[in-house]
């Protein structure tokens, strides 16, 4: 499993995507380069697929040259951005990037397994993802119990678990102005979708449509959707330890653990060069 490629998903320009605090494009590029350099310097992954879904132009050859300096390979992909991301949320866009990368990438196409990391972040204890051979290996965390025992909210959660149901709930909120607290999701568990390892065929069979049910405005995230789908299948290796995360969250705009100054300075220089004409 240590030979599998790492897919990094990136969005430099989030447009009108809701619930994203870090919106400045130059800052996003900087933090993405911090995460990329950390993976190049400190991980076992020798092949990295860097996939982004926005129109910001960069000098992609610099990514390949930077990886080569570490004896590693980077494949750069540009995935078309769906307009539904602005309506359904960042988890929808994330799913579109992963699906597009699996369809277009030469490195991912050759590999039976792949690892995935959200851009801007680095997982220090990523060896936990490679510890055993499962069809999927994920971090699991409990969500606050927000009334799941109610028959009404059990029905609402069932609706969130289908594509048709999730669209109906979103339309009820957006068009009919049904109050949020009547139709919001109340998940009991989440999958930490920032980092996971998955068998390619397993992902395509079980998780490739999970993002289509995401409704961030109603509290039904990609994390909840993944958990609901993985509950129905076998072959999942759950990790209940805390992930040791470095980098800046685009959602919260906060830094979990900062990178060392030397890496941050190199990332700053790389980001400026990437964006230069």
Q: Which residue ranges define each predicted feature?
A:
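ER/Golgi luminal nucleotide-sugar-dependent glycosyltransferases, focusing on the catalytic module
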Residues: 1-277
């Amino acid at each position: 499993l240590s030979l599998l490629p790492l897919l990094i998903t990136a969005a430099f320009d989030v447009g009108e995507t809701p619930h994203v605090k870090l919106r400045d494009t130059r800052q996003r590029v900087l933090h993405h380069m911090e995460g990329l350099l950390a993976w190049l310097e400190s991980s076992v992954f020798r092949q990295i697929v860097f996939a982004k879904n926005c129109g910001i132009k960069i000098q992609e050859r610099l990514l390949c040259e930077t990886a080569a300096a570490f004896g590693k390979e980077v494949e750069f992909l540009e995935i078309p951005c769906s307009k539904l991301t602005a309506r359904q949320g960042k988890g929808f866009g994330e799913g579109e990037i992963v699906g597009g990368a699996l369809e277009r990438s030469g490195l991912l196409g050759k590999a039976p397994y792949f690892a995935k990391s959200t851009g801007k972040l680095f997982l220090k204890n990523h060896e936990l993802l490679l510890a055993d051979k499962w069809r999927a290996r994920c971090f699991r965390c409990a969500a606050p119990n927000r009334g799941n025992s109610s028959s009404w909210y059990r029905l609402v959660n069932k609706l969130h678990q289908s594509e048709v149901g999730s669209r109906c709930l979103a339309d009820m909120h957006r068009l009919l102005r049904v109050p949020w607290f009547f139709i919001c999701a109340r998940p009991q568990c989440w999958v930490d979708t920032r980092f996971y390892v998955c068998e390619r065929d397993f992902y395509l069979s079980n998780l490739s449509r999970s993002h289509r049910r995401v409704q961030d405005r109603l509290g039904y995230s990609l994390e909840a959707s993944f958990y609901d789908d993985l509950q129905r299948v076998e072959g999942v290796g759950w990790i209940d330890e805390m992930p040791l995360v470095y980098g800046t969250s685009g959602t919260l705009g906060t830094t979990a653990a900062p990178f060392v100054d030397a890496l941050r300075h190199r990332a700053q220089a790389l980001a400026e060069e990437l964006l230069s004409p």
